[in-house]
Structures are given as C-alpha cells and as structure tokens.
A protein has these predicted regions:
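Extracytoplasmic/lumenal domain signature
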Residues: 1-355
Length: 355
C-alpha cells in the first residue's frame, strides 16, 4: 500500500513471518537509485500492542490504508491488516490451520513504531483476500480449503460491528470486493460471482454462475474492478477475462480467452484493459484487451493484443498513461527468479521492453 505525505512516498508492506519473529509490517520510505529505507517495522511475535502476533509464514492479504481524507497528515491514519495467525509445525516446514486469522488496526503510523490493536479475532479460515472498502465498511473473505465454505465479512469502520455472508460451499482466495454504492461484488472459487446489498449485507444478495456461460470458467481469484461506466471486470483461473454488469440483475456482458490461466486484477485506462496471465512458473505474460461501449450502453471487444510474454505474471499491472497514447506498464513475475519489469505499449501489435 502506497502513501504520499508532503511529497514523500511511503510503502506499507505485510510480509511472511517464517521463523520466530512471525509476520511483520514494514513502513518503507521510497526513493530513487537504491535510496529507499525502512522507517519502522512492527515488533516480533510476542510483544502485545506493537506486534501482529501472527505466527504463520503465509500471508496473502493486502492491507487497507484509511487516511481519513487528509493525505498530507498521517497522524490520524489507520492501516487495517489481515493475517493468518496460527500454524502447526511439521518436519521441513509448516502446515496451515483453518483457525486463528484476525484483522488488526495499526495507528500512530507517523511515530517511531505503530500501535497494534485487534479489530476482529478468531476468524475461521485463511484471510487470503485484500481488505477493501466503500468508505463506510471494510470487506474481506476467508478460504478454508477445498470445497469448504468460506465467509465474506462486512465490518463497519465507525464501530467495528460485523455482518457476514457464508455460501453453501467454496471460499474466497485473492478475491477482493468492489462497491457501486448500493451493492458490493466479489468472486469465489468454483466460478461464482456474488453480489450483496450494502445495507443488508447478511440477508440480501445473489449469485451469478459463470460456468453457465463457460463450463471451464475456473476459480475467481482476482479482485473485481469497476470502471466509470459501472462495468465489472475480473479474471478466472480458467484463463478468462470477464466483463459483467448489474442492471436488471447481475449478467455477463462478455468474456474472452486469455493466453493462459489468470489471477491478475484487470487494470483499465481509457479503452485499454491490461491483464497478466501465467502457465506454471516459467511461462505467461501480459495482454491488452481494447473495449468499446455501444450506442445501447453495452460493452464489446474489438481487439486483443500481446504486450509481453515469456514469464508468469500473476500480479496486477500498474499503468502510467491514459490509454490513448503510449502507456508504461509495471509488473512483477512469480518465477524461481522473479523480477520487476517495465514495458511500453502504444496500441500496436505488441509492447516493447523498457527495462
């Protein structure tokens, strides 16, 4: 999570806690040419009030930073962090348990060390989704493994009151939520896209079964992205990019096959949607899907182009540009020798490597 305060950019990073220290959050001052430095880290496991006290070395949830609407004043900011806090040792590693996950609030982010307080503890399953917000509530989901049912949570920021939704089966993995102001949308394993009422999260909602459109849709393991026209975009492990809308109900506008499976949250600038894909740990790349809106308000696909290839990309794509000229794309790879890349793309037949 990035934050810029009075011209200085900071990154808050949750990282795996293998060993005695447990999971940690670090605040990093970002600078060019190798000049970045760590401002603080939370304390190792066992220090109440300044430690996450999360023993698992497996952490996948992206934190959420609430800057209270004052981006140049970090004194009242809160960083919400979800962790898997328990595991059982076995010879040669660790085996994750389905209990012990929790959400914490880190305050005093401008101090030498933050204060850590519990928001919600005793959560069943792994918190493997990012924590997202609609400005009033936090949203996140859990994954208990296999076809076991996970739970999606709605936590009110003002008092930490909780409402939950638990489907009949399957959980939520990397599947962050997005809101249109009335409903919230999130995907799950087994090719399902859910909507829930913000006002009545625990009682009112529905589901769209993507396998009715593509039997090989696969798990939804990306966050749902919504554009200014209200269309919802996400990817599935069956190797598809999807566009859905909520008009008279949740429906599929279109879906398109990608180069391979995908867990990448789409990034849309102008009419271009950038998305990563991968096949194992040594193949994949980035593609650009160009979309248009018809006179009837529907969305359709005029073209798909390769931007980069030769490496597995599971991350989202950070884009500098507006989708009309040359865009610069930044991403990393999930490989034995992973790396960060920058590519440029101007709407042509392919992209160009910058570094």
């Amino acid at each position: 999570v990035l934050q810029t305060v009075n011209g200085t950019t900071y990154a808050y990073v949750l990282y795996d806690g293998y060993g005695a220290s447990g999971a940690l959050v670090a605040k990093v001052r970002c600078a060019e040419n190798g000049g970045s430095s760590i401002v603080w880290t939370t304390d190792p496991y066992g220090t109440e009030g300044t430690s996450l006290n999360a023993k698992s070395g497996f952490q996948l949830s992206t934190p959420y930073l609430d800057d209270k609407g004052t981006p140049d004043d970090a004194s009242d900011d809160t960083l919400y962090v979800g962790t898997i806090s328990q595991y059982d040792d076995y010879e040669g590693g660790e085996w994750l348990t389905g209990t012990g996950s929790k959400v914490m609030a880190l305050t005093g982010l401008d101090q030498n060390k933050p204060t850590v307080t519990n928001v919600l503890t005793g959560i069943n399953g792994q918190i493997n989704t990012p924590i997202t917000t609609d400005g009033t509530y936090l949203y996140f989901g859990t994954w208990p493994g296999g076809s076991n049912a996970g739970t999606y949570y709605q936590v009110k920021l003002s008092d930490y009151s909780v409402k939950t939704f638990t489907p009949d089966s399957y959980g939520f993995y990397w599947a962050g939520a997005v809101s249109d102001g009335t409903n919230v949308y999130f995907g799950s394993d087994n090719g399902l896209l859910y909507w829930r009422s913000i006002a009545d999260f625990d009682t009112t909602g529905g589901v769209l079964d993507l396998t009715d459109v593509a039997s090989d849709a696969g798990n939804v393991r990306s966050t749902v992205m919504m554009d200014e026209d209200g269309f919802l975009y996400f990817t599935t492990q069956g190797g598809y990019l999807w566009c859905c809308s909520y008009k008279d109900g949740l429906t599929v506008e279109w879906h398109i096959k990608l180069g391979a499976t995908s867990t990448s949250t789409p990034t849309k600038v102008g009419d271009r949607i950038y998305v990563g894909y991968y096949s194992g740990f040594n193949a994949g790349g980035v593609q650009c899907v160009t979309v248009s809106i018809g006179e009837d308000g529907s969305s359709y696909i005029p073209s798909v182009a390769p931007v980069a290839s030769g490496f597995p990309v599971q991350s989202s794509i950070v884009v500098m540009g507006d989708g009309t000229g040359t865009d610069y794309l930044y991403f990393n790879t999930n490989a034995q020798k992973g790396a960060g890349y920058c590519y440029s793309y101007d709407g042509g037949t392919t992209g160009s490597k910058v570094w």
